[in-house]
């Protein structure tokens, strides 16, 4: 898979959230970089799985972690 060539920004709120793992923080940045004008991201867990060479289950856990912490 060709790696994307765009910037991802992680807000201070997310960067310093002690409840989030570093992987979840990185995924948050990736998701926000892919948001459209309506604040929607249509990338699938499989997309992120391929991008980071992690299982879909792992990606789902990271997303659940973000969701459980209000992101």
Model-predicted regions and their roles:
Residues 1-71:
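Short recognition helix of helix-turn-helix/winged-helix DNA-binding domains
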């Amino acid at each position: 898979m060709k790696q994307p060539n765009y910037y991802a920004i992680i807000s201070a709120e997310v960067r310093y959230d002690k409840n989030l793992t570093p992987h979840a923080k990185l995924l948050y940045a990736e998701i926000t970089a892919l948001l459209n004008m309506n604040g929607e991201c249509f990338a699938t867990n499989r997309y992120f799985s391929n991008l980071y060479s992690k299982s879909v289950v792992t990606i789902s856990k990271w997303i659940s972690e973000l969701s459980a912490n209000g992101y």
